[in-house]
Amino acid sequence: MLRRSLENRDAQTRQLQDAVTNVEKHFGELCQIFAAYVRKTARLRDKADLLVNEINVYASTETPHLKQGLKNFADEFAKLQDYRQAEVERLEAKVVEPLKAYGTIVKMKRDDLKATLTARNREAKQLTQLERTRQRNPSDRHVISQAETELQRATMDATRTTRHLEETIDNFEKQKIKDIKTIFSEFITIEMLFHGKALEVYTAAYQNIQKIDEEEDLEVFRHSLYPQDYSSRLDIVRANSKSPLQRSLSAKCVSGTGQVLTCRLRKDHQTEDDDEEDEDLDVTEEEN
């Protein structure tokens, strides 16, 4: 009867040991992966800082509107990296550290398991010794009584450590579930806060880029490229960019203007001829 009880408790202990081993394995993996996730996020922040610097350097070489738009974008993007830094710090404190703490917690539970196993092994050893004593010296009541006393002590110790282990593992399981809920809730909250801020910042950055006046910057570029004859070239470009209707109207205006000028020239020429004829008549009359 006692040996069957020992076997049942051994099976229970193995189950508790498997539970602790399972937590040790998977919490260790989760801790390593979350830590790598945080490191990757920190490296992304560092690369973003380099990108901000390069954008500012490039912006200083560009035309006014493009320069201002890029600098505003860089400012917003730099602001986002401040939020990313906060994300890294929070993930480290709220996710990685609690998982890392389970290394110590699991070690303590293994110590409890070890103490329980030691007590049960002692109990099993005393039971085996009592059975041998009864077989070898069935009539020696003193030796048998002494072996029974040792077994009773070992059983009491094993029962006490087993009860303590059961309570400890029960609390461990309860705390594990609570911690998992807390850790993953913190992870989701931190990520949501960051991405919410990121959406605001990216919206502002997008608006800054869209505000860049392409035409104004293009005129500034052309003026710097053709400082002397920029106006005439610009007129040519504008003329070439007119619609067919505008070009037709312009041609008609030019044609009408030419016809008016031709009529005026002909009229002036006719007037001059008439004046010359009048002068010739006057001279003839005087001679007569």
Curated annotation (Swiss-Prot):
Q: Which ranges are annotated Acidic residues under compositional bias? A: 271-288
Q: How does it sit in the membrane?
A: Peripheral membrane protein
Q: Where in the cell is it found?
A: Cytoplasm; Cytoplasm, Cytoskeleton, Microtubule organizing center, Centrosome, Centriole; Cytoplasm, Cytoskeleton, Cilium basal body; Cell projection, Cilium
List, alphabetically, the GO terms of the cellular component aspect. Answer: centriole; ciliary basal body; ciliary base; ciliary transition zone; cilium; cytoplasm; mitochondrial inner membrane; nucleus
Kindly report the protein's main subcellular placement as a broad class.
cytoplasm
Domain of life, per UniProt, equals: Eukaryota
What stretch of residues directs this protein to its organelle as a transit peptide?
1-47
Question: Which residue intervals make up region (BAR-like)?
Answer: 10-220
Q: Which CDD domains match?
A: BAR_FAM92
Q: How does it assemble?
A: Homodimer (via BAR-like domain). Heterodimer with FAM92B (via BAR-like domains). Interacts (via BAR-like domain) with CBY1; this interaction is required for targeting FAM92A to centriole and cilium basal body. Interacts (via BAR-like domain) with CBY3; both proteins form a ninefold symmetric structure at the flagellar base; are recruited to the annulus in a mutually dependent manner and regulate annulus positionning.
Q: Quote the function comment for this protein.
A: Plays a critical role in regulating mitochondrial ultrastructure and function by maintaining the integrity of mitochondrial morphology, particularly the organization of cristae. Preferentially binds to negatively charged phospholipids like cardiolipin and phosphatidylinositol 4,5-bisphosphate enhancing its interaction with mitochondrial membranes. Induces membrane curvature and tubulation, which are critical for maintaining mitochondrial ultrastructure and the organization of cristae. Plays a crucial role in ciliogenesis. May play a role in limb development through its role in ciliogenesis.
Under PANTHER family, the record lists:
CBY1-INTERACTING BAR DOMAIN-CONTAINING PROTEIN 1 (PTHR21223:SF4), CBY1-INTERACTING BAR DOMAIN-CONTAINING PROTEIN HOMOLOG (PTHR21223)
What does the comment on domains in this protein's record state? The BAR-like domain displays limited similarity to other BAR domains.
Describe the family membership recorded for this protein in Swiss-Prot or TrEMBL.
Answer: Belongs to the CIBAR family.
In its UniProt entry, what is this protein called?
CBY1-interacting BAR domain-containing protein 1
Please tell me the species this chain comes from.
Bos taurus (Bovine)
Gene coding for it? CIBAR1
